[in-house]
A protein has these predicted regions:
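Short membrane-interface loop/juxtamembrane segments of multi-pass integral membrane proteins
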Residues: 134-156
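Long, highly hydrophobic alpha-helical transmembrane signal-anchor segments
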Residues: 56-112
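Hydrophobic core of alpha-helical transmembrane segments in multi-pass integral membrane proteins
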Residues: 69-85, 111-122, 220, 239-254
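Membrane-helix interface/capping segments
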Residues: 116-140
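Alpha-helical transmembrane segments and their immediate juxtamembrane interface regions
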Residues: 180-215
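Hydrophobic alpha-helical transmembrane segments and immediately flanking/interface helices
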Residues: 166-192, 254-259
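Core segments of transmembrane alpha-helices
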Residues: 151-166, 217
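Hydrophobic alpha-helical transmembrane segments in multi-pass integral membrane proteins
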Residues: 217-232
Length: 260
């Protein structure tokens, strides 16, 4: 492997070629005989290592992550209410079973366009690269992003699906059930935005944050309604208080450790 100094410019040697990204230096070895790139020998060197508190600018990364989030939330709110009010009331939704079936259909749409597409993206890249052998150790930045997207989407599917099913239970008619497709549209859009943003930079994945937030809000609504059924107003307040307390505890417990 050949590293070129300074890191601000690309360079070439008899055995290697470097390319400079915004935050990454990529070094590729070339075949000494044929001069062809060896895909198995691509090396990525982080210039700002998060494990190194001296060189990693946390505040800059936080600012870069928060900005897309701030832009995404107003768009998500408009999208949710726009979907809700533009859809006509749905017929035959007075029966809870019909509403649950409708929630299942919405979940299927979300899984198809957000999860299955991620699986296909990884599968296509494996088919057309040395990664067709999963044990070869070959990967690319694109594949790593797609794999992280898949893992994150799988994690977020659980609260989303549970939320839309619970929401369907408490939507009493064809008018209020429109909240289910509105939530689904926002979640799908947020997942796609997260995926595209992640490929641009790790900070821009924050544009998908409204997807998780809408799932949390729906679950809180379902839990407060459930609590009200059990113990009235007090029962409705308890889940909110406990969740806010848990968030505060997690915020405190996950603060970074100071290195000497």
């Amino acid at each position: 492997m050949v590293l070129c100094k300074p890191l601000t410019a690309p360079c070439a040697t008899e055995i290697g070629v470097t390319e400079r990204g915004d935050d990454i230096l990529i070094v590729r070895k070339t075949d000494a005989l044929w001069g062809l790139p060896k895909l198995m020998q691509e090396t990525r060197v982080d210039k700002g290592d998060p494990a190194d508190p001296v060189n990693f600018d946390l505040r800059r990364q936080q600012t870069a992550t928060i900005m897309p989030i701030a832009v995404a939330f107003p768009v998500a709110i408009v999208l949710w209410f726009g979907t809700y009010y533009m859809l006509p009331p749905l017929a035959g939704m007075e029966d809870v079973v019909a509403r649950l079936v409708f929630a299942l259909k919405c979940s299927c749409v979300a899984i198809l366009f957000c999860f299955v597409t991620g699986i296909e993206a990884v599968a296509h890249e494996r088919l057309r690269s040395p990664a067709i052998d999963p044990l070869s150790g070959y990967d690319t930045p694109r594949m790593r992003v797609n794999l992280r997207y898949l893992q994150n989407t799988l994690e977020q599917l659980a609260p989303f699906v549970a939320g839309v099913f619970g929401l369907a239970v408490y939507c009493s008619d064809g008018r209020s059930i429109r909240a289910v497709p509105a939530t689904t549209v926002v979640w799908i859009a947020a997942r796609i935005a997260f995926w595209i943003g992640y490929h641009r930079s790790s900070a821009q994945r924050g544009i998908g944050a409204p997807g998780m937030v809408v799932s949390i809000l729906v679950l809180l609504y379902v839990c407060t309604r459930f609590g009200f059924e059990i113990a009235g107003t007090v029962g409705a307040i308890v889940p909110l208080v406990l969740f806010v307390g848990a968030e505060g505890l997690l915020f405190w417990a996950t603060k970074p450790l100071h290195h000497r």
